[in-house]
A protein has these predicted regions:
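Short acidic-glycine loop/turn motifs at beta-strand connectors
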Residues: 106-109
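A surface-exposed partner-binding patch
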Residues: 1-101
Length: 139
């Protein structure tokens, strides 16, 4: 079986180093547990902008602006609270498209979803591993 490389730090610009306890503090406050894959992604891309601004899933094109800042635990929780009408308890917002859309990760199903706050629609995209591969691929 081929190993999917996620050693792609060069695909992220303006990354803010993640504070030592940022993720564990957030997990504790939200009473959740992040997967190692999600933690690794946030560590290498925290508040970063993707060099790849657009990507395709099926016939749909998506814009990716940046990963949210996981160092600002209280602000992130407040922001998630402002989106609570669209979020399930097992979903966490982790990035945006710069146009009112947000990328969510469902921790139960391991699926990344796109939330369009203009019309309230939520669309399942890919499992986390495939989403990161698509987002961080250079090809």
């Amino acid at each position: 079986m081929d190993r999917i490389s996620t050693e792609t730090e060069l695909n992220w610009e303006f990354v803010e180093p993640l504070n030592k306890n940022a993720l564990s503090d957030l997990e504790e406050r939200l009473e959740i547990g992040f997967s190692d894959e999600f933690k690794d992604f946030i560590k290498r891309s925290n508040y970063g902008f993707s060099q790849l601004r657009y990507f395709m899933v099926g016939n749909e094109s998506y814009t990716f602006k940046h990963v949210l800042d996981f160092n600002l635990e209280s602000l992130l929780i407040d922001f998630m609270q402002s989106l609570k009408e669209w979020l399930e308890p097992e979903e966490i917002v982790f990035a945006n498209d710069g146009y009112g859309g947000y990328y969510l990760w469902n921790m139960t199903t391991d699926v990344v979803l796109f939330l369009d706050t203009d019309n309230g629609s939520k669309k399942a995209l890919l499992n986390l591993n495939m989403f990161l591969k698509k987002l961080e691929s250079r090809g």
